[in-house]
Amino acid sequence: EPEKRIKQYPFELSGGMRQRVMIAMALACEPDILIADEPTTALDVTIQAQILELMQDLQKKLGMAVILVTHDLGVIADMCDNIIVMYGGRICERGTAREIFYNPKHEYTKGLLRSIPNVNNMKKKLVPIAGTPINMLNLPAGCAFCTRCDAAMKICLTEHPDELTINENHKAACWVNIRDRLMAEGGEGNV
C-alpha cells in the first residue's frame, strides 16, 4: 500500500516497515555499495529474517556490494563472505567467513566466538570477554584489546602490531601471532 505509507509518519510504522523505508531510500539511486549499519537492531527474529532476505535479494538483483556493520555473529555467519573484525576503531582480523569462524587468530575474535551460545550443548557455560570495553577517548598506544586479553605481553601495551598474513584469505594484527610465527621460523619468539 505505497499510497497509504507515503503519507504516514515514521512513528506510525512498525520497526520492520521503517527498515524497509530506509532500504528503499538507500537504494533509490541504485548505488554500487550499500552500507547497512546494524540493519536488524530492535527487530524481532521473523522481521529480521525478512529484512536480511530482502537485502540479499536486492544485492543479487542490483549487483551491488553490501557492507554490513553488526555485532550479531549469527547474521554475519548467514550473510557475509568476508569479515573484518574491529576493536577500538582498528582492524584486528580480516578474512573469509570460514577462516574467521573456524580459525580465528586474534584474541578478541576468539573471545567473541567463545561467547556465542551453543545450541547443541546448552549446558556449556558461556565465557564472557573479561574487563570493560575500551574508552575510545583514551586509547592505548598499543593494541586496544590488550587490557582485556589473557595472552597480552608487554609489547601489546606500547606498540600496535602490524597485520600478519596467516594465508591469502586471512590476516590478523596480534603480537601473539607474530611471536608464534617467529618461534615457528626458529627464532626465540621475542617481540
Question: What kind of feature is each model-predicted range?
Answer:
Residues 1-4, 120:
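Conserved "ABC signature" C-loop
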Residues 4-9, 124:
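Interfacial catalytic loop of ABC nucleotide-binding domains
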Residues 9-13, 17:
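Conserved ABC ATPase signature
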Residues 17-19, 47:
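Residue-level micro-sites within transmembrane alpha helices that shape
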Residues 22, 65-67, 142-144, 148:
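ABC nucleotide-binding domain signature
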Residues 30-31, 35-39, 43-124:
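P-loop NTP-binding/switch modules centered on Walker-like glycine-rich loops
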Residues 94-191:
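Short catalytic/signature loops enriched in Gly
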